[in-house]
């Protein structure tokens, strides 16, 4: 079991105070501060000795028990969710988003060589999908299987228990185009580097195939088992395998697994939408409340409204984040009345508070 964040932090504080010596505490700070200040300056001279587990990615469906889904996911760092969309649904979403995608240029607008390479010179990364596709909202944003995975991931092992959408964007990569650099997605949230591979997940990614993913057209490449490696182990492209999928399938990966968009060796476009989900105490990649229209939000369920930041967030042990006058944001936005908001939050009101359940003596 992965130690939850609060236990790792509290244990560190308890260890410090147990020294009963300012001198020892000062030595501890001097010894560890450089590592904190250089969170993601992981040394490059560490021998690269980690090896992949050599597994093919498992394939599951929405009918697969979550225990089995998570077993495969935690073992290799990725799992393929089959037939989440029908080909007709995928085509409908593509059609509804056509004008939105056409309005976005290929390649990055940022004049920075590394960022431009990571973006992909022939890749279209279009956001603001929720306003433009009713089918996307109904079949992805409101998908019960997707939310069940999120609830399990961000609720287990002492995790914060609440989550929201970080980004919903296209990753439409035309070819020919070289592969991305191998990376871990958790680099967006540097403190998680201190927790190591046994820490809780800072984010998860659902990569939906809107065209077939093949080895030749740039299927996401992943190093199975690298989610368990020390973070100074970076792997290499020869250790990766392609996550080949049919249109409508979805690749689920966590923030700790090493992966990259593969090289597109063809003249065709590999079409993808990524749905990135994070604990609701972290900052999303997309500023949804400034992008999604209120008239669109009113068409969503309460769960989806909270998912995109139009309702308050309630991580375990918190009296509420993202509020107005210290109360549910939906009241301020006219999305609910007090009675409706309280009924919706009953599961939050009934949960034990984190500070009531921590046994500090046993940490």
UniProtKB/Swiss-Prot annotation:
Catalytic activity annotation: sphingofungin B1 + 2-oxoglutarate + O2 = sphingofungin B + succinate + CO2
InterPro entries in UniProt: Phytyl_CoA_dOase-like
Pathway: Secondary metabolite biosynthesis
Gene that produces this protein: sphC
Organism listed in the record: Aspergillus fumigatus (strain CBS 144.89 / FGSC A1163 / CEA10)
Function statement: Dioxygenase; part of the gene cluster that mediates the biosynthesis of sphingofungins, bioactive molecules acting as sphingolipid inhibitors via inhibiting serine palmitoyl transferase (SPT). Sphingofungin biosynthesis starts with the PKS sphB that produces an C18 polyketide precursor 3-hydroxyoctadeca-4,10-dienoyl-ACP containing one delta-6 desaturation and one delta-12 desaturation.
Keyword Metal-binding: yes
Entries under Pfam families matching the protein: PhyH
Catalytic activity, EC: 1.14.11.-
Known uses: The sphingofungins A, B, C, and D, show a limited antifungal spectrum of activity but are especially effective against Cryptococcus species, fungal pathogens causing opportunistic infections in human.
Class of enzymatic activity (EC top level): oxidoreductase
Gene3D superfamilies the UniProt entry points to: q2cbj1_9rhob like domain
Cofactor: Fe cation
Subunit-level organization: Homodimer.
Disulfide bonds: none
GO terms for biological process, alphabetical: biosynthetic process
UniProt similarity note: Belongs to the PhyH family.
GO MF terms held by the record: dioxygenase activity; metal ion binding
The name this protein goes by in its record: Dioxygenase sphC
Keywords attached to this entry: Dioxygenase, Iron, Metal-binding, Oxidoreductase
SUPFAM superfamilies for this protein: Clavaminate synthase-like
Expression triggers: Expression is positively regulated by the sphingofungins biosynthesis cluster-specific transcription factor sphG.
UniProt binding sites for Fe cation: 183, 185, 259
Keyword Transcription regulation recorded: no
């Amino acid at each position: 079991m992965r130690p939850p964040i609060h236990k790792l932090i509290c244990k560190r504080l308890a260890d410090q105070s147990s020294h009963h010596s300012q001198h020892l505490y000062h030595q501890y700070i001097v010894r560890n501060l450089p590592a904190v200040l250089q969170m993601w300056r992981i040394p490059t001279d560490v021998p690269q000795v980690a090896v992949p587990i050599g597994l093919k990615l498992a394939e599951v469906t929405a009918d697969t028990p979550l225990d089995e889904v998570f077993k495969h996911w935690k073992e290799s760092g990725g799992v393929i969710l089959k037939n989440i969309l029908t080909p007709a649904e995928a085509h409908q979403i593509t059609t509804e988003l056509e004008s939105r995608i056409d309005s976005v240029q290929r390649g990055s607008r940022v004049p920075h060589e590394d960022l431009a390479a990571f973006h992909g010179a022939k890749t279209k990364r279009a956001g603001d999908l929720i306003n433009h596709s009713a089918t996307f909202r109904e079949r992805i944003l409101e998908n019960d299987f997707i939310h069940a995975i999120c609830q399990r991931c961000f609720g287990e092992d002492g995790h914060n228990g609440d989550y929201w959408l970080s980004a919903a964007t296209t990753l439409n990569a035309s070819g020919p185009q070289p592969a991305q650099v191998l990376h871990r997605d958790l680099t967006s949230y540097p403190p998680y580097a201190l927790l190591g591979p046994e820490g809780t997940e800072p984010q998860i990614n659902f990569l939906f195939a809107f065209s077939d993913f093949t080895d030749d057209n740039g299927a996401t490449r992943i190093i199975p088992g690298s989610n368990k490696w020390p973070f100074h182990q970076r792997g290499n492209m020869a250790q990766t395998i392609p996550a080949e999928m049919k249109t409508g399938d979805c690749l689920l990966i966590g923030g700790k697994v090493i992966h990259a968009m593969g090289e597109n060796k063809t003249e065709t476009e590999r079409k993808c939408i990524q749905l990135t989900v994070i604990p609701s105490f972290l900052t999303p990649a997309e500023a949804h409340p400034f992008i999604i229209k209120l008239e669109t939000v009113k068409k969503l369920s309460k769960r989806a409204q909270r998912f995109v930041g139009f309702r308050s967030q309630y991580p375990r042990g918190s009296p509420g984040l993202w509020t107005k006058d210290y109360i549910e944001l939906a009241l301020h936005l006219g999305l609910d009345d007090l009675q409706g908001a309280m009924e919706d939050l009953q599961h939050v009101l009934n949960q034990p508070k984190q500070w009531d359940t921590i046994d500090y003596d046993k940490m």
